Amino acid sequence: MKKNKRLMVMAGGTGGHVFPGLAVAKKLQQQGWEIRWLGTADRMEAELVPKHGIDIDFIKVKGLRGQGIKRLVLAPFQILNAIFQAKAHIKRWQPDAVLGMGGYVSGPGGIAAWLSGIPVVLHEQNAVAGLTNHWLAKIAKKVFQAFPGAFKDAPVVGNPVREDVVALPDPMQRMQDREGAVRILVMGGSQGARILNQTMPQVMAQLGSGFEIRHQAGKGSADEVRLAYQQVGVEHVEVSEFIDDVAAQYAWADLLVCRSGALTVSEVSAAGVGAIFIPFMHKDRQQALNADHLVACGAALMIEQPQLTVDKLAGEIQKLGRDTLLSMALHARAAAQNNADQVVADAIVALTEQK
């Protein structure tokens, strides 16, 4: 009896790494592949991945950026230990390929796979390559990038996006007959965004009536944000810590106000919704660069955090009538690259057939 092929996905830390990995995993599961995950026990993958019916192994590893002298001295030993842990998991399960989607776990996992003779496939979600993927690209059999600029010669394929987001009706079908309050969805990503939690209640108080708000505040912040809206007299607002059915929220919204993490940018485009991006302030402007192409094509506006004020954001929202919002949504949908999960899955299949 022919044995099913096996893929080990290495991804963790944030939804921006984990959800694209799940999208590729689902494509291969549909072709009969067995999937196993490599992650860390204290990050979101530990809880999220098993909910999708995928077994997960853990290694102990942490990032190096911004750490003190003691951590830097110990780092080589900790990395070696993580590589040995990953190698043990790989030896026990014997995957045919590994897929690195970023996060601290991908580094030791990718090196362990390479040392074990297992082909490594990488996908970089951001417009600026993370430190882990920058080094792993040198040993990977295949490298993909979501946006131009992360790597010089890697194919640009977009980000793997959940099928329920891709399957949403066209913006024209959703939005052309809408009337009444403009629907604003505020999203801070899987961790929430303090700047949005602090700013949006004041923005909506300044704008007054005519808007309906749904605000994803992040873990532990919902009560505080709900109170902030109440204190400035804003009604018609729903506040939650996390969004389970993100596709339904995109379908509901006329406008997003959000960070521009890689997955958010790709989902905004796939869904076809206009956005005002407030990029997180990386020193390499990673999130700003992620969103540049949607701003350039008229699908989005961007206010970088140093320039963000209540007056500025309120003014930008006030300018956006329904015709403009529909136009932005259509431009967003037109810019979407929605087959990244299939492209990456096909590359993994092709690599294993060469073995």
Curated annotation (Swiss-Prot):
Cysteine pairs bridged by disulfides in the record: none
UniProt subcellular location: Cell inner membrane
Enzyme Commission number(s): 2.4.1.227
Catalytic activity: di-trans,octa-cis-undecaprenyl diphospho-N-acetyl-alpha-D-muramoyl-L-alanyl-D-glutamyl-meso-2,6-diaminopimeloyl-D-alanyl-D-alanine + UDP-N-acetyl-alpha-D-glucosamine = di-trans,octa-cis-undecaprenyl diphospho-[N-acetyl-alpha-D-glucosaminyl-(1->4)]-N-acetyl-alpha-D-muramoyl-L-alanyl-D-glutamyl-meso-2,6-diaminopimeloyl-D-alanyl-D-alanine + UDP + H(+)
One Gene Ontology term, aspect cellular component: plasma membrane
First-listed, main subcellular location of the protein, grouped into a coarse class: membrane
InterPro entries linked: GlcNAc_MurG (IPR006009), Glyco_trans_28_C (IPR007235), GlycoTrans_28_N (IPR004276)
GO biological process, alphabetically ordered: carbohydrate metabolic process; cell division; cell wall organization; lipid glycosylation; peptidoglycan biosynthetic process; regulation of cell shape
Role this protein plays: Cell wall formation. Catalyzes the transfer of a GlcNAc subunit on undecaprenyl-pyrophosphoryl-MurNAc-pentapeptide (lipid intermediate I) to form undecaprenyl-pyrophosphoryl-MurNAc-(pentapeptide)GlcNAc (lipid intermediate II).
Name recorded for this polypeptide: UDP-N-acetylglucosamine--N-acetylmuramyl-(pentapeptide) pyrophosphoryl-undecaprenol N-acetylglucosamine transferase
Native source species: Vibrio vulnificus (strain YJ016)
Gene encoding the protein: murG
